[in-house]
Amino acid sequence: FTHMLLQKAGVPTPDATVAFSKDSALEALKKHGFPKIIKPTVGSWGRMVSKLNDMDAAEGIIEGREAMYPIHHIHFLEEFVQRPPRDIRVIVIGDNVAAGIYRNSGDGNWKTNTHLGGSAETCEITNELEDICIKAKDAVFGDIVGIDLMESNEKGMVVHEINNTTEFRNVVRVTGVDIPGLMLEHVKGLA
């Protein structure tokens, strides 16, 4: 649903397909090719996010998901974006892009989650980054969100996730921006 709202609003995203069964997921992969990323529709910390390099890997991972709760029978298949070995996490509070960090992949891992060994460093908020993040927040009717973006080698900046219960510990640690304080001030202003 988030992906559709972003596309409707003209926010750049990786190409994606949603499948509601093992057979339709495998058919989509045959049609669109590899590599692909398969993600749960709800989750955090990169858990259950896998890179599918071929049909054998796809069949094994999708078969495992089919044995789980029905929510995991929704297969969100996303293009594998060729990019630098990092992504960007930006915290948006109301109409303020508060801070951002680069999350660098660790130990050759394609995932950028810092708890998997990645590192974080400050990301300058450019006008382009600010515009995309505000547009993305508005597209999903968000107020306080974490937006994850990738710098695609082909498409430029693309939004690959929006978190309405975002983690911000590393953003605070790296940038020194008081995200909890900004959130509190924003919420008090809404009262």
Regions found by a protein language model. Give the residues of each.
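A short glycine-rich, hydrophobically flanked beta-strand micro-motif that places a catalytic Asp/Glu
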Residues: 78-79, 88, 142-154
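C-terminal active-site "lid" helix and adjoining low-complexity regulatory extension at the edge
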Residues: 138, 151-191
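Active-site nucleotide/adenylate-binding loops and adjacent lid/helix of ATP-dependent enzymes
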Residues: 1-76, 82-85, 127, 191
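Short strand-connecting beta-turns/loops that link adjacent beta-strands
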Residues: 43, 95, 152-155
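Protein kinase-like catalytic core scaffold
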Residues: 36, 76, 99, 145, ...
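Generic beta-strand structural signal
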Residues: 18, 92-93, 151
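Phosphate-binding site of ATP-dependent enzymes
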Residues: 47-139
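Short, glycine/acidic-enriched loop or turn micro-motifs at the edges of active sites
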Residues: 42, 82, 149-151, 164
